[in-house]
Amino acid sequence: MPSVMIRRNDEGQLTFYIAKKDQEEIVVSLEHDSPELWGGEVTLGDGSTYFIEPIPQPKLPITVRAKRAGEA
């Protein structure tokens, strides 16, 4: 379960950075994106999916733990 940093780039898109892999991808979908609930399943530009435990919408950038979707 890697730690990832999520932030907005200069174009206003969410980016998902995995330091362990030195990989940064654009977030193409986020399951929950409201002030009350933010997170859930995250789909990246390369097609991979991760899961972030839903929380109230945070200020960005934020570092969170994410797991590959489908992992137990």
Swiss-Prot record:
Keywords: Nitrogen fixation. Pfam families: NifT (PF06988). GO terms for biological process: nitrogen fixation. Gene3D superfamilies: NifT/FixU-like. Disulfide bonds: none annotated. InterPro entries: NifT (IPR009727), NifT/FixU_barrel-like_dom_sf (IPR024044). NCBIfam families: nifT_nitrog (TIGR02934). This is Protein NifT. It comes from Azotobacter vinelandii. The gene is nifT.
